[in-house]
Structures are given as C-alpha cells and as structure tokens.
Design a protein with these regions (language model features):
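Signal-transducing coiled-coil linker helices
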Residues: 1-26, 32-50, 57, 62, ...
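Conserved nucleotide-binding and Mg2+-coordinating catalytic segments in signaling enzymes
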Residues: 19-37, 69-82, 91
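Heptad-repeat coiled-coil signal-transmission/dimerization helices
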Residues: 35, 39, 90, 94-97, ...
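Short catalytic/binding micro-motifs of nucleotide second-messenger systems
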Residues: 49, 99-104, 136-147, 178
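Catalytic core regions of nucleotide second-messenger enzymes
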Residues: 58-61, 109, 138-154, 170
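Hydrophobic framework residues that shape the active-site pocket
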Residues: 74, 93, 107-110, 115, ...
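Short helix/loop segment flanking the catalytic signature motif in cyclic-nucleotide metabolism enzymes
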Residues: 89, 116-136, 169
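Catalytic-core segments of nucleotide cyclases and related cyclic-nucleotide turnover enzymes
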Residues: 128, 132, 146, 160-179
C-alpha cells in the first residue's frame, strides 16, 4: 500500500513539473516550448492528411491554423502605468482567449506581449473569424489596475497549414500576415 502511495506522489510531481515546464505562469497558457510541442503533433496529422488522404478513412485533424496576436503599444502601457499594469493586460488577454476558443485548441504566450493560437480543424477563414472576434472583444474590454480603468488593442495575423511544410513555415506566414 505504501508503494502505491509513493508511486501516486511521483506521478503527481511529474505532472506538476511538466506543467511548470510547459505553462506560462502569468497568463496560465502554454509557453513557447509547450505550445510548439503540442502544435507540431496536430500539424503533422493535418499534413499527412493533405499528402496522403487515401491512407486512412478518417483523420483526427484535416486542417490546422495559427493565429498570432501582439498587444498594440505594449511598451507605452508599461512605461506609462508600470509593469504590473502590463502584467494585468497579459492576464486579461490570456483569459479572454481561453473564453473564446474550444478546449481542443491551443493557446500560448509566445513571449513578451505576443500570443499564439493553434486552431485544430480550422482553415484560414475560420482562424480569421476567431481572430476578429478576439480582436473586437479586446477592444471593448476594460481592465482595472489600481484606481485606473485601462484598455488596449491587439493586432493579429492568421495562416493555415496548406502553404506550410512545417511549424516554422506556418509561423512565418502568420507573423507576416500580422503586418
């Protein structure tokens, strides 16, 4: 019985360590490493379907799209109100993203003020609609910082896997679409 308890403790510790290695503590989303590892699995499945649809009758993932968001004028927000205000903006965007995507989709804080979504089964048009919904919702969302009520906007870019050979290609396409 003691052995089972020790095994359970080890499993829980492994789970905790994996979460801390793959999650961004501030936004509660995946970090870059965790997102990329998960996204590559789905992307490989979508590419396999595209290249060889005859190999199987059903595929888990037939489409995969990325959406990248960047908080507009984030440096100015930090410089004007302080880093805690910037942190609140990051938390607000992370929370709003999670409210607007499905449980199967992926979301990460890619770094700094940049966020990325992996939309499972989505084509470019689907991704655009989701990105536009998030962009509009953020534009109308206010967050409280101390006694101040602040707001911010985001810019985004989308791309689907159809023109990409790998994750890096797909990321570059979505990043380019942002500008």
């Amino acid at each position: 019985m003691a052995q089972k308890s020790e095994i359970q403790k080890l499993k829980e510790e492994i789970k905790r360590l994996k979460e801390s290695a793959y999650k961004d503590e501030l936004s509660k989303l995946y970090n870059r490493h965790g997102f990329k590892e998960e996204a590559e699995k789905f992307l490989k499945e979508a590419i396999a379907f595209q290249k060889h649809p005859e190999r199987r009758e059903s595929f888990l993932v037939k489409n995969f799209a990325l959406t990248i968001f960047d908080i507009d004028n984030f440096k100015q927000l930090n410089d004007t109100y302080g880093h805690q205000a910037g942190d609140e903006a990051l938390k607000t965007l992370g929370k709003l993203i999670l409210e607007r995507i499905r449980d199967i989709d992926l979301a990460a804080r890619w770094g700094g003020e940049e966020f990325i979504l992996g939309l499972i089964g989505a084509n470019e048009n689907d991704a655009y609609n989701i990105a536009d919904d998030i962009r509009k919702k953020i534009a109308e969302t206010k967050f409280k910082y101390g006694k101040k009520i602040l707001k911010f906007t985001v810019s985004g870019g989308v791309a689907d896997f159809s023109q990409a050979k790998n994750f890096e290609d797909l990321f570059k396409l979505a990043d380019k679409a942002m500008y």
